[in-house]
Amino acid sequence: MRSAWWITTWLLAVCLGVPASAAAYDKDDFLAPEGKARIVFIQNQRVDRKMTFTVFESDRRCVAEVGGREAQVLDVFPGPYIFYVQGYNDTRRIELFPMAGRTYFIRLHTVTKPMGAVPEVTLVRRESEEHMRLRVSLEGALVTQSRDNEKCYARPLKERENRTNRRLNEANGDWKNGDDAYRDKYTLIERDGLTRQDIALF
């Protein structure tokens, strides 16, 4: 009897002491609205939880600020877009060709190199390894709307303007001087977007 009591007590302690894994998301969070495409910026590595990535357009207006295990949603009309993703001392240029009714995922994270952690942007392309791991990448992330970030959304980047311009020019230089494989790595085309049927299969 005493043994059974200890087992029951231990099981109860385990259940109370280990927090349940929060639901990563509701699938509906990622459905594109009528006539628009949805872009989801994922920053969800524990090691990066204190880091913030800033995403802005070529007019230097902020469209997203992602940090702390977050999946931030941005809705856009169809058409080509150039975005710049800034993290630490690095800025990366990416190009998107979103299609209405589809959802595109971009993972923001760091990779470890000899000189330390380096920011990286990984575009989730259809049928890629990242596509297959998408559920894992989203697990535990808080879904937010970029338009709710009043400090960022649609505001010009005024702080450290000269430094921002320099990094933007460097990112454009990397794009221009890179080969086709480099540009392909940082480009999402229409077919890379997930349909409503794809998202239903998450």
What is the predicted role of each segment?
Residues 22-80, 84-202:
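Short loop/turn and low-complexity linker motifs enriched in small/turn-promoting residues
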Residues 1-5:
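Positively charged n-region of N-terminal signal peptides that target proteins for export
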Residues 8-17:
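Bacterial N-terminal signal peptides
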